[in-house]
């Protein structure tokens, strides 16, 4: 049987491993790109799975003063579409990482959804 000190060291090592995996996952999520679109692709927003916006593209046909409000609405919709996709990818990646840790289904670590 393990001593209390050995069990504490094992718990500390497990916590460090989890922290390292979480840090690795944050780096991975920042490297995965998603694209949100609105207006049939007239406005697109590229973002990382971590939610960092990489770019916005607005079709030239929308660059008219009378289209200003529509462009604003489309940019908002494209941003929200990209954010939703980033959230889904992030949740999938975290679930995959959690599964690789051998944790029981439904057991959620802080920061893992």
Residue ranges and their predicted role:
Residues 1-31, 35, 85-113:
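Long amphipathic alpha-helical segments used for membrane anchoring, targeting, substrate engagement
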Residues 74, 78-89:
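Stable alpha-helical structural segments in soluble proteins, enriched in small hydrophobic residues
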Residues 30-33, 37, 41-42, 64, ...:
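Small cofactor-carrier domains centered on a conserved lysine used for covalent cofactor attachment
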Residues 3, 67-74:
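Conserved acidic
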Residues 11, 51, 75:
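Residue-level signature of catalytic and energy-coupling elements of molecular machines
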Residues 56-68:
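A short interface-forming secondary-structure element
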Residues 37-56:
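N-terminal intrinsically disordered, cationic/polar leader segments
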């Amino acid at each position: 049987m393990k001593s209390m000190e050995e069990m504490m060291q094992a718990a500390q090592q497990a916590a460090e491993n989890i922290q390292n995996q979480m840090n690795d996952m944050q780096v991975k999520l920042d490297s995965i790109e998603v694209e949100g679109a609105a207006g049939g692709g007239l406005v697109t927003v590229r973002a990382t799975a971590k939610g960092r916006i990489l770019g916005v593209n607005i079709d030239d046909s929308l660059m008219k003063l009378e289209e200003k409000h529509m462009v604003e609405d489309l940019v908002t919709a494209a941003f929200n579409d990209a954010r939703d996709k980033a959230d889904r990818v992030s949740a999938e990646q975290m679930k995959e990482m959690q599964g690789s840790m051998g944790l029981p289904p439904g057991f959620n670590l802080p920061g893992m959804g």
